[in-house]
Amino acid sequence: MQTRATTPRSNRTAVVTGATSGLGRAAALALSKEGFHIIAVGRDQIRGQEIVGEIHEAGGSAELVTGDLLTAAGTQAVADEILSRTSAIHLLINNAGGAFNSDERTPDGLERTFALNVLAPHVLTEALLEALSAGEARVVNVVTAVPARASTSIAAIAGDKAKSGMQSYVANKLALLTLTVEDQRRYGERGLSFVALHPGVIPGTRFGSDSPGLMMKIGPVIAKLIGITSTLDEAAQRFVDVGTKSVEGGGFYYEGVLREAPRQARDQAFASELRSTLEALG
């Protein structure tokens, strides 16, 4: 079941994935206050109706598209539903993602971390490309801080030896950062801009809900002790800033501040191999 909007009051449309909780919900609320008509994408119908209702009550405009981004077919179905609602998209927030402890596979046979964090944003962006071009859109891919030694092996990210947990999550977010740089190179001339955003570590969100129990308990504590936590309001404002202000196409924004992308993300050979892998799967 899909929830359609009342008459949109804005001629700017923002699509936000993972919009039914946590960072995605906060971003959707903040962007609606900036005048965007929100297309909220999520799996949970009840949570989705709640966020749409909250936006409407605040005087904004929103609608819900429910679907599962864990498979290419599911992601394509979400894209098709979005395109049935609008012909122009001005902002796409690829926020849906997660870290998984168990080494379970999707119905497509792919490791879940890769399927949700890399393949889904690629399939969705490609499927919406004409509508994004019509809106001269900005695409914001949500990534994370990347250690200097993070893997750029396709086999480690998407192959049979892909690992679960945070190691896989970081490697896949590096792949998404690489894809951001590559998509800017490929589609920038169409009037599109692509940026990668690490919005900060946000205690209390549902991120990592399938991660090891010990990591779930001590991760937020360690983050707080070393001073790398942010509030939901701070993170939401970072989405607004990179989504609406002047940015460097292909840039990596760490907590909203432009930083040089890790060298791995600028590796053209890895970028080409990654895109070939994604095109074969999507």
Predicted regions and their residues:
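Conserved glycine-rich cofactor-binding loop
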Residues: 20-21, 44
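A glycine-rich helix->loop->beta "capping" turn
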Residues: 9-10, 58-61, 81-94, 100-105
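Catalytic loop of short-chain dehydrogenase/reductase
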Residues: 5, 97, 101-102, 111, ...
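Rossmann-fold cofactor-recognition segment
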Residues: 56-73
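C-terminal helical subdomain
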Residues: 220-263, 268-272, 276
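Conserved glycine-rich Rossmann-like NAD(P)H-binding loop of the short-chain dehydrogenase/reductase
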Residues: 34-50
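Active-site Tyr-X3-Lys motif and surrounding loop/helix of classical short-chain dehydrogenase/reductase
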Residues: 73, 77-84, 101-103, 108-115
